[in-house]
Amino acid sequence: MHPRFQTAFATLSPLLQQAIRPILSSADFAGFISAQQADGVKQQCGLDDSELAFTLLPLAAACAVAPLSDFNVGAVARGKSGTLYFGANMEFVGATMQQTVHAEQSAVTHAWLRGESGLAGITVNYTPCGHCRQFMNELNSGTDLTIELPGRAAATLGHYLPDSFGPRDLAITTLLMDEVDHGIAPRGDKLEQAALAAANQSHAPYSGACSGVALQTRSGAIYAGRYAENAAFNPSLPPLQGALNLLNLGGEELSDIRRAVLAEASGAKLSQRSASAATLAALGCHDLITIPLVKM
């Protein structure tokens, strides 16, 4: 079990500890619990979906990287598949606040990058800020997404974001977590291929500036993130943050990044290059290359 979970794990009931210890102790645990594993825990502990998600919140919050605020937020997203995805806030010393990742963004993007096609609900230990409410409004679940908070009845995103503005107001029909293929040709080494594959599935209906980032750590592991645009623009999540999110939830250290590849279209209306380079430099990685997208 990763050391970061030990304090939160100690607060769980003995029965839940017994049920979840094998999952957390698995060498390949990467911050998500499969539908089959979740069903087993629920059956063993007599919990429903909502109760299990709430009990997992301290474990999700333990994944937070919050050197600026010292305020750990955890989220658990439940995919339509039944898989549970951890999310936690991330902050980066030496970068701007605009580069931070909110826990809800973390959980949603985690599910998306793992291939989930839609969310049934999300459970958070603190009320979602307006930024996150707007971010979640880009999802294909729309305002019907169920949000659960401690001490409150479950409510929809529409309850927390009345009179919302979203992709449908801009006649966008392909929503976040919908399956997409931009026809980008794969090429290069494994890290470059991962960045291109991420760009191929990115969500950029407003700018058309598809992009993906792939990171390689000291262990040789590769983590790739996709650009997730938002109808309100500012809540958009850059591809680097998606990759950093997977790396962190996978139990690796941000200081272990050795190489980075950004794949983006030449001559696009916007570029991720400067912001990605600045954030990576703050994390100690200066080996960033940019490769163009080529259509098949």
UniProtKB/Swiss-Prot annotation:
It comes from the Bacteria. NCBIfam families: cyt_deam_dimer, PRK09027.1. The keyword Cell wall biogenesis/degradation does not apply. Binds 1 zinc ion. Belongs to the cytidine and deoxycytidylate deaminase family. GO terms for biological process: cytidine deamination. The keyword Metal-binding applies. InterPro entries: APOBEC/CMP_deaminase_Zn-bd (IPR016192), CMP_dCMP_dom (IPR002125), Cyd/dCyd_deaminase_Zn-bd (IPR013171), Cyt/Deoxycyt_deaminase (IPR050202), Cyt_deam_dimer (IPR006263), Cytidine_deaminase-like (IPR016193), Cytidine_deaminase_bacteria (IPR020797). The active site is at 104 (proton donor). Substrate binds at residues 89-91. Its cofactor is Zn(2+). This is Cytidine deaminase. Pfam families: dCMP_cyt_deam_1 (PF00383), dCMP_cyt_deam_2 (PF08211). Its EC number is 3.5.4.5. It catalyses: cytidine + H2O + H(+) = uridine + NH4(+); 2'-deoxycytidine + H2O + H(+) = 2'-deoxyuridine + NH4(+). It comes from Erwinia tasmaniensis (strain DSM 17950 / CFBP 7177 / CIP 109463 / NCPPB 4357 / Et1/99). Residues 48-168, 186-296 form the CMP/dCMP-type deaminase domain. One of its GO terms (cellular component) is cytosol. This enzyme scavenges exogenous and endogenous cytidine and 2'-deoxycytidine for UMP synthesis. Homodimer. Keywords: Hydrolase, Metal-binding, Zinc.
